A protein has these predicted regions:
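C-terminal solvent-exposed extensions
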Residues: 175-244
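Solvent-exposed coil/turn segments that connect beta secondary-structure elements
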Residues: 6-9, 17-22, 38, 65-68, ...
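Soluble periplasmic/extracytoplasmic beta-strand elements of cell-envelope proteins
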Residues: 1-5, 13-18, 32-34, 48, ...
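Amphipathic, coiled-coil-like alpha-helical scaffolding segments used for oligomerization/assembly
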Residues: 36-102, 179
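Flexible, polar/acidic helix-loop-strand segments at domain edges
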Residues: 73-161
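Extracytoplasmic strand-loop-helix segments at the start of, or within, the mature domains
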Residues: 1-38, 137, 219, 223-232, ...
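Extracytoplasmic/secreted envelope proteins and their assembly/folding machinery
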Residues: 30, 42-50, 65-69, 73-75, ...
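Second-shell loop/turn segments in exported
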Residues: 31-39, 54-59, 130-138, 151-157, ...
Length: 244
């Protein structure tokens, strides 16, 4: 899960909520925070995240893996910086899944690391990678990296009509409680935002949790400390986008 917000200064913040945070799930006992969506959809997920991190979240956008592939392809792909290890992982994945891709296409292997252009299948596989030594920490960082890349792609067009057309065409792949007017406002706002200025953070922050591997592997989180750090980040942007 990612919380996207804008503070009073108009600065955009992106906060990953790691899936292994252990919480109370009303009516379902205790479990990982990502189970909230399974048990109660977006409404329960918003309620749980709001309660534990002292936020007021009432709007959501949900996109599954296949839909994200379609959305990225609709935009014409994205440009991302990848490491050599990430390149090797991607080539292995696309070779294995090319017959299962949404378009049925054969995806050519990436020939170099660094800045590369990725289609939807490649970009989504990149965000799912947990095998580069960074585990789930790296995965959440790549998710934020992809959202920034999408924002950059949108901003390069500098065309409100194109963006509104993309929003209408992509609507079928998205579940949201945003109304059309709100979607339009956010789309136009995206044209004015500098993706490089988007602040990124991860919850739980380093040093604020312990790993419990007795039974169901999860994070025992210092919620008060994380609420404090999150408030500071959302207000002043003092956070970290480290992958460790």
């Amino acid at each position: 899960m990612i919380v996207l917000s804008m503070n009073q200064s108009g600065e955009v913040r992106m906060t990953s909520i790691m899936r292994d945070i252990w919480v109370d799930l009303p009516g379902h006992g205790e479990g990982r925070i990502n189970a909230a969506t399974t048990y109660g959809g977006a409404e329960l997920a918003m309620r749980i995240v709001s309660r534990y991190f002292d936020l007021r979240i009432d709007k959501y956008v949900m996109v599954n893996i296949k839909s994200m592939v379609n959305i990225i392809d609709l935009l014409g792909g994205v440009d991302l910086e990848i490491t050599e290890l990430e390149r090797l992982y991607l080539n292995t994945c696309t070779a294995r899944t090319q017959w299962e891709s949404q378009s049925g296409r054969v995806i050519p292997p990436l020939e170099h690391s660094g800045l590369v252009h990725l289609c939807g299948d490649q970009a989504v596989e990149h965000t799912r990678n947990r095998f580069d030594g960074g585990g789930d920490y790296g995965r959440t960082a790549r998710q934020r990296q992809l959202l920034k890349a999408i924002a950059k792609k949108i901003r390069t067009k500098k065309d409100p009509l194109w963006l509104l057309s993309m929003a209408r065409r992509g609507r079928k792949w998205v579940q949201t409680n945003l109304n059309p007017l709100e979607v339009g406002r956010i789309a136009l706002l995206a044209l004015r935002q500098d993706p490089n200025a988007i602040g990124c953070f991860r919850i739980p922050a380093e040093g604020t949790y312990t790993i419990n591997d007795a039974g169901s592997w999860h994070f025992e989180t210092d919620f008060e400390k994380n609420r404090q750090l999150l408030r500071e980040f959302l207000k002043n942007g003092r956070g970290s986008d480290e992958m460790q």
